[in-house]
């Protein structure tokens, strides 16, 4: 199946001034309304990582769950859930981070990873990189390492991919948008 970049980007809806004035939110829900596009996204990630040497897939709450869980299933890898504060029932590790909207906390079960594990982190989008950096810090606190940070969309003008790369975390995104791109 050929990956059609222009059709793919047309399925990501810009929502102006959401969730606050001045923000252009990239809504991926239309992408999931197209089984063909969803399959192309999943297949692209599966093909990229089918031979890669890593042990776990970490998914960010909540839109990272949509793609990362299917990729984990396809690659037969354990899934690690990184949740918003207060959503996990057992002992957790917590990490504060800044989003483009304000401060938040990311949590993971403290027994999710072991020393020597290697994690591919999935989110829907890289903006400031705050969520993925917080997840990387949690991964490292458990003695594991980050293989790569992955998203459907990169917003390079917000600097997240650069921040991740500066922290020696490679990134991979299927597409990118300029902030003013409609």
From Swiss-Prot:
Compartments where found: Cytoplasm
NCBIfam families documented for this protein: apt (TIGR01090), PRK02304.1-3 (NF002634), PRK02304.1-5 (NF002636)
GO molecular function: adenine phosphoribosyltransferase activity
InterPro entries the record matches: Ade_phspho_trans, Adenine_PRTase, PRibTrfase_dom, PRTase-like
GO biological process: adenine salvage; AMP salvage; purine ribonucleoside salvage
Source taxon at top rank: Bacteria
EC number: 2.4.2.7
PANTHER family named in the record: ADENINE PHOSPHORIBOSYLTRANSFERASE, PHOSPHORIBOSYLTRANSFERASE DOMAIN-CONTAINING PROTEIN
CDD domains xref list: PRTases_typeI
Catalytic function, reaction form: AMP + diphosphate = 5-phospho-alpha-D-ribose 1-diphosphate + adenine
Role played: Catalyzes a salvage reaction resulting in the formation of AMP, that is energically less costly than de novo synthesis.
Subunit field text: Homodimer.
Protein name: Adenine phosphoribosyltransferase
Cellular component terms (Gene Ontology): cytosol
Entry similarity comment: Belongs to the purine/pyrimidine phosphoribosyltransferase family.
HAMAP family the record matches: Aden_phosphoribosyltr
Disulphide bridges, residue numbers: none
Organism listed in the record: Pseudomonas savastanoi pv. phaseolicola (strain 1448A / Race 6) (Pseudomonas syringae pv. phaseolicola (strain 1448A / Race 6))
Keywords of the record: Cytoplasm, Glycosyltransferase, Purine salvage, Transferase
Group of enzyme by EC: transferase
Primary site of residence: cytoplasm
Pathway: Purine metabolism; AMP biosynthesis via salvage pathway; AMP from adenine: step 1/1
